[in-house]
């Protein structure tokens, strides 16, 4: 296995300096900031990553305003009250990528977020309270309880 230091040095070399490399890295939020996030943001990010999987990301990004309009800014509460026939109508809206299987994940993941929030106060609090030394356990949870959040989709959404 290649040593981390070798990988790091190669990255520094490619970017020109440690400062330039570090400028490209994001700073993770602390638990307090994560806990303050609105649960609708999680649903939006899960949905974005589900749709980006298997598509050109630029296509999804270009249509994202349409997704937000069609799905009420990913309001968990509104999506939980949506009747099934309305979901079919929304899945055929030209403002979004019309992939019914992926559209079905939106209310399914809204339900998962709602269920977790009922037990933990909010989905954000659940994420903030998750032990940082068991991130793989969180990925497994999302895979098991979420819709299409296995593989890299769940981990990418948590970034």
Predicted regions and their residues:
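Short hydrophobic alpha-helical segments that form membrane-spanning helices or hydrophobic packing faces
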Residues: 154-159
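N-terminal polyanion-binding entry modules of DNA glycosylases/AP lyases
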Residues: 1-96
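Alpha-helical ds-nucleic-acid-binding substructure associated with the helix-hairpin-helix region
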Residues: 72-145
């Amino acid at each position: 296995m290649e040593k981390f230091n070798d990988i790091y040095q190669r990255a520094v070399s490619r970017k020109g300096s440690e400062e330039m490399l570090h400028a490209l890295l994001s700073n993770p939020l602390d638990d307090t900031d994560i806990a303050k996030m609105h649960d609708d943001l999680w649903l939006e990010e899960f949905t974005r990553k589900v749709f980006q999987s298997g598509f050109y990301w630029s296509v999804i990004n270009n249509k994202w305003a349409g997704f937000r309009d069609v799905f009420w800014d990913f309001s968990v509460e509104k999506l939980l009250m949506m009747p099934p026939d309305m979901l079919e109508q929304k899945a055929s809206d030209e403002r979004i990528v019309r992939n019914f299987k992926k559209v079905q994940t939106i209310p399914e993941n809204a339900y998962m977020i709602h269920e977790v929030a009922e037990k933990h106060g909010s989905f954000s609090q659940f994420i903030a309270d998750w032990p940082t030394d068991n991130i793989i356990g969180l990925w497994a949870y999302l895979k098991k309880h979420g819709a299409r959040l296995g593989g890299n989709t769940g981990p990418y959404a948590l970034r």
